[in-house]
Amino acid sequence: MTKFVFVTGGVVSSLGKGIASASLAAILESRGLKVTLIKLDPYINVDPGTMSPFQHGEVFVTDDGAETDLDLGHYERFITTRMRKANNFTTGQIYKTVLEKERRGDYLGKTVQVIPHITNEIQEYIKRGAGLGTAHEVDVAIVEIGGTVGDIESLPFLEAVRQMSLRMGPNNSAFVHLSYVPWIAAAGELKTKPTQHTAKELRAIGIQADALLCRADRPIPDDERAKISLFSNVPEWGVISMWDVDTIYKVPRMLHEQGLDGLICDKLRINTPPAKLQRWDELVYEVEHPQQEVSIAMVGKYVDLSDSYKSLNEALRHAGMKNHARVKIDYIDSETISPQDVSRLAKYDAILVPGGFGQRGVEGKISAARFAREGKVPYLGICLGMQVATIEYARHVAGLKNANSTEFDPETPCPVIALITEWKDADGTVKTRNEKSDLGGTMRLGAQSSDVSAGTLAHSIYGDVVTERHRHRYEANVNYLDELRAAGLVISALTQREHLTEIVELPQDVHPWFMGVQFHPEFKSTPWSGHPLFNAFIKAALDHKARSAGGAKNLKAVA
């Protein structure tokens, strides 16, 4: 029978519930348990697909094509279970489902209310996410409830998990609550009152926390933990200190050493072998002992919020670890780059242009791609980054001076990038769209496979077939591919059905490392293996740094 751990948060948002949940899952998995995680988001949007990155951060895409919360990226990087559409749902999805049932007459004329209809539907979604009765069923499902206790948006979710815990009976569920313990510099002490109040508010809803994770900028002394225990009705061993660390990969060891996993296993009556966290210790050692440093210029549109590129940041750091190097990322707003000052990118060892939507800042990205191509600086373009590299090449090499994307100029005479009108989705169904289609849920999403041409840089990285996750509406226009090929651009991967362009590159006798990919490889990177594309990109950056230093000896790098 699947056991459940419900993770809630109090006082303020952004405490790190996602990292805490993923870390607990990682420890339980190291004990031999099959674990999954589910994220409940209390906003009314159906999914985060149409939300601004400044509002929500990155949209993480699963293999089956779900646009989800960025916490699912943490989940996949910390445990081996792959996330699915069922692992993330929102208030919008719940209400949409309930209203559809009401319209069909499924409720047999009853008055549809938050309790029981909304709360029952939430419980059904949680069970679906845990894979109950299917091949995806797990030993433990950790359910992270977004928002903060006390928010009106979260109340139906908290009521639903309270009911669910009651129905499952004792020892089948546990509650973990994150709180904030601020350090007041003027007083020179930690203040526990906010944590006392959030635990009290949780009890008023009918939920008693089994463990309190107390977030602070420093370890919490034993006397303060005892005080929190007394006023929150949580045993002292259940008051866990969770202080700031320089890498998130230290959190599993931190929580384990304070006995969180043992407490949860005792509460759920689960007998397991001891936790094995050696690989986490080795990972932290690799983070803390780089042999060299490499600097990457990330030229993007959403650089004011690093969470907009969360998986990308992690993928670069993973690749750095595989190459025994610290990766220093400088975020550069593409709106600030012009052909006149693009040379300021010369100090970097490589240039990366990530995905994005809309016209703002596009010309700056095109200038960055041109600088990388002409200066022989390693370049990786992802999604829009591939498209701007294609536009740049068409304008300045292929002679198509007015080349553009119909996303930025619908009337362009040379639409080298255009809207995809038909494609096969991750589940094999054929999808169509046009300029008047809704924005939400109409992109090419999820894992897609492509054939890779032999003898190319892409083939040396991926082999014969590449399968990666996608999230885009626009694609290289097949009507211009022959002209681009004739001008020297290598189209090294095409989809197997529609022959859509997936990878473009320059011959290695023309440029040492220049590649654009239509997909999002960052979603499949892990701290254990990195990702072959990013591993190769960071190695190319290290090689470029060595060449720029006049042939200085390069330390061994592994791609």
UniProtKB/Swiss-Prot annotation:
Q: Which domain of life is it from?
A: Bacteria
Task: Provide the Gene Ontology terms for cellular component.
Answer: cytosol
Pathway-wise, it operates in: Pyrimidine metabolism; CTP biosynthesis via de novo pathway; CTP from UDP: step 2/2
Q: Which InterPro entries match?
A: Class_I_gatase-like, CTP_synthase, CTP_synthase_N, GATASE, GATase1_CTP_Synthase, P-loop_NTPase
Protein's name according to its UniProt entry? CTP synthase
Q: What else is known?
A: CTPSs have evolved a hybrid strategy for distinguishing between UTP and CTP. The overlapping regions of the product feedback inhibitory and substrate sites recognize a common feature in both compounds, the triphosphate moiety. To differentiate isosteric substrate and product pyrimidine rings, an additional pocket far from the expected kinase/ligase catalytic site, specifically recognizes the cytosine and ribose portions of the product inhibitor.
Renumbered to this chain, the signal peptide range is none
Q: Name one GO biological process term.
A: pyrimidine nucleobase biosynthetic process
Q: What is its EC number?
A: 6.3.4.2
Q: Which organism is it from?
A: Variovorax paradoxus (strain S110)
State the UniProt keywords alphabetically: ATP-binding, Glutamine amidotransferase, Ligase, Magnesium, Metal-binding, Nucleotide-binding, Pyrimidine biosynthesis
Name the positions where CTP binds.
S13, D151, I152, E153, K191, T192, K193, P194, T195, Q196, K227
Say what the protein does: Catalyzes the ATP-dependent amination of UTP to CTP with either L-glutamine or ammonia as the source of nitrogen. Regulates intracellular CTP levels through interactions with the four ribonucleotide triphosphates.
Catalysed reaction(s)? UTP + L-glutamine + ATP + H2O = CTP + L-glutamate + ADP + phosphate + 2 H(+); L-glutamine + H2O = L-glutamate + NH4(+); UTP + NH4(+) + ATP = CTP + ADP + phosphate + 2 H(+)
Domain named Glutamine amidotransferase type-1 is located at 295-547
Oligomer and partners: Homotetramer.
Q: Which GO terms describe its molecular function?
A: ATP binding; CTP synthase activity; glutaminase activity; identical protein binding; metal ion binding
- Record-annotated active site: C383, H520, E522
Q: Which residues bind L-glutamine?
A: G356, L384, G385, M386, Q387, E407, R473
Means of activity regulation:
Allosterically activated by GTP, when glutamine is the substrate; GTP has no effect on the reaction when ammonia is the substrate. The allosteric effector GTP functions by stabilizing the protein conformation that binds the tetrahedral intermediate(s) formed during glutamine hydrolysis. Inhibited by the product CTP, via allosteric rather than competitive inhibition.
* Residues binding UTP, per UniProt: S13, K191, T192, K193, P194, T195, Q196, K227
Gene from which the chain derives: pyrG
Report residue spans for region: Amidoligase domain.
1-270
Q: Coiled-coil intervals in this record?
A: none
